[in-house]
Design a protein with these regions (language model features):
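N-terminal amphipathic/basic-hydrophobic helices that include classical n-h-c signal peptides
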Residues: 1-11
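Extreme N-terminal starter segment of soluble prokaryotic enzymes
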Residues: 12-17
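Short N-terminal binding/cap micro-motifs at the start of the first secondary-structure element
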Residues: 24-29
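Pocket-forming structural segment of enzyme catalytic cores
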Residues: 109-189
Length: 247
């Protein structure tokens, strides 16, 4: 596999669709990593009226990020995004759902999204354990950064690739689609913003306090960076294999 700065020259003109849910949101480390691999980011915000493509012919993959919304919200753009996930799955292009985007994939696959029965949330660094299928993809760090109070069960026909303690299903695969409940995209600047603007979330049961986030970051972030690099190489290769098979 390519290293952190490995560039795929065949991807120099390819685009990855990036779906964000707030005006000031960024794709963080995921966006940086994709650019380092030669991909152009096509950033869209359906919440503010940006359309989503009817096919993936002009995109190498798609990433739907998180946000303060719930996959259970009645907003039209939430329902539209959940339905739209069928486009990359149909076209056999890589799809990655992060947090809200993962919950949307679970909903698309017919699974429910729910709050913890004891009102617990995961905000901070938490243990995540890969399954045998997850270990076959890449090496995993001991912890991942989390920021959510809803979770999901494994949809029928999907493959569990990571699990946790508070919310058991942490990551799964559905064809060329991946759902991850955690946030490998978070940079130090993003953590500063989230823990300031979202301070109220750290009052929920089970969450880590702000000082713990910053104390844990130097302990776990190196492993998360390495995981993201290896995972993205695997994820992008899904689309390249489909393209080679079609030719």
């Amino acid at each position: 596999m390519k290293g952190w700065f490995g560039l795929n020259t065949t991807a120099m003109t390819e685009r990855v669709l990036i779906v964000l849910h707030q005006e000031q949101s960024t794709p963080g480390r995921v966006g940086y990593s994709l650019r380092q691999r030669g991909y152009e980011l096509d950033i869209r915000r359906p919440r503010f009226g940006d359309p989503l493509p009817k096919t993936m012919a002009d995109h190498a993959g798609a990433v739907i990020f998180g946000g303060p919304q719930s996959a259970n919200d009645p907003d039209d753009f939430i329902k539209a995004e959940i339905d739209w996930i069928g486009v990359p799955l149909r076209d056999q292009k890589p799809y990655l759902g992060i947090c809200l985007g993962a919950q949307m994939l679970a909903r698309h696959m017919g699974q429910r999204v729910f709050t913890h029965p004891e009102g617990k949330a995961e905000v901070g660094y938490y243990p995540v354990r890969p399954t045998a299928a997850g270990r076959a993809i890449c090496d995993w760090p001991d912890h991942q950064y989390q920021w959510h109070r809803e979770g999901f069960d494994l949809p029928n026909g999907c493959e569990l690739i990571a699990e946790g303690d508070i919310f058991q299903t942490q990551a799964f695969r559905a064809g060329t689609g991946y759902a991850i409940q955690f946030h490998p995209e978070v940079t130090h600047a993003m953590m500063c913003r989230w823990t300031t603007r979202g301070a109220g979330r750290m009052e929920l049961p089970g969450t880590k306090q702000r000082h713990e986030h910053f104390a844990d970051r130097p302990v776990y972030d190196h492993g998360i960076r390495a995981w993201l690099a290896e995972f993205l190489d695997h994820w992008l290769a899904l689309g390249q294999r489909q393209l080679a098979a079609a030719e």
